[in-house]
Swiss-Prot record:
Keyword Endoplasmic reticulum carried by entry: no
Protein's name according to its UniProt entry: Adenylate kinase
Pfam families hit by this protein: ADK, ADK_lid
GO biological process: AMP salvage
Residue ranges, annotated region (LID): 122-159
Assembly behavior: Monomer.
Record lineage: Bacteria, Pseudomonadati, Pseudomonadota, Gammaproteobacteria, Legionellales
One GO molecular-function entry: ATP binding
Gene label: adk
Gene3D superfamilies (alphabetical): P-loop containing nucleotide triphosphate hydrolases
Chain positions recorded as AMP binding sites: T31, R36, G57, L58, V59, G85, F86, P87, R88, Q92, R156, R167
Purpose of the protein: Catalyzes the reversible transfer of the terminal phosphate group between ATP and AMP. Plays an important role in cellular energy homeostasis and in adenine nucleotide metabolism.
Free-text note on domains in this protein's UniProt record: Consists of three domains, a large central CORE domain and two small peripheral domains, NMPbind and LID, which undergo movements during catalysis. The LID domain closes over the site of phosphoryl transfer upon ATP binding. Assembling and dissambling the active center during each catalytic cycle provides an effective means to prevent ATP hydrolysis.
Length: 218
């Protein structure tokens, strides 16, 4: 089962990814994790990436693809894998295709921008414990304070509306075109193309997961 999840920030990809890797016993392949592991091991690709990152540059798609190919040789990928945060751009998607790294399913979890903003901007954190609340979906007993300690809750900078809107702009300009790319490829009838599905990201975690499993196992 070789999977990729697409969707905006706050669409629920991380939650569903955790459930999917547990159900299908496949690893979650994260470019960030791969970079850190390659640098720690001192592999040639890792050392190349480290030099670029230390100089403040962006790691090239060639290096990222090389790391992906290296990672997929590990025995834990024999049953498949789930891509997390990769590819992010059309250039990376084309590079993945050229490298003949095949996918079975690409699933877009679709959520309206305004709902994403409400989901993320409503989060409140109790920093010392890491407890998370939501002003609408999981409010504290008393507004603005932690249930257990009575200490104040904060809103992280990443959860502020202005920051979320900027992240959504980046998503729509860079990553959302992947939806069209994989949709058109699937519709082309190519044997190499993964199946493409769009599901609603609105509903309970369990409902969304059941919808994904139905797609994958039908």
């Amino acid at each position: 089962m070789r999977l990729m999840l697409l969707g905006g920030p706050g669409a629920g990809k991380g939650t569903q990814a955790s459930l999917l890797i547990n159900r299908y016993k496949i690893p979650q392949i994260s470019t960030g994790d791969m970079l850190r592991a390659a640098i720690a091991k001192g592999t040639p690709l890792g050392l190349s990436a480290q030099k670029i990152m230390e100089s403040g540059g962006l790691v090239s798609d060639d290096i990222i693809i090389g790391l992906v190919k290296e990672r997929l040789k590990n025995p834990d990928c024999d049953r498949g894998f789930l891509f997390d945060g990769f590819p992010r751009t059309l250039v990376q998607a084309e590079a993945l295709k050229d490298a003949e790294i095949h996918l079975d399913h690409v699933i877009e979890i679709a959520v309206d921008d305004e709902e994403i903003i409400e989901r993320i901007s409503g989060r409140r954190i109790h920093q010392p414990s890491g407890r998370v609340y939501h002003v609408v979906n999981q409010p504290p007993k008393n507004p603005g304070v932690d249930d257990i300690t009575g200490e104040p809750l904060i809103q992280r900078d990443d959860d502020k509306e202005e920051t979320i809107r900027k992240r959504l702009q980046v998503y729509h300009s860079q990553t959302a075109p992947l939806v069209q790319y994989y949709k058109e490829w699937a519709e082309s009838g190519s044997k190499e193309a993964p199946k493409f599905h769009t599901i609603s990201g609105t509903g309970t975690v369990e409902q969304i997961f059941d919808n994904i499993v139905t797609i994958l196992e039908t």
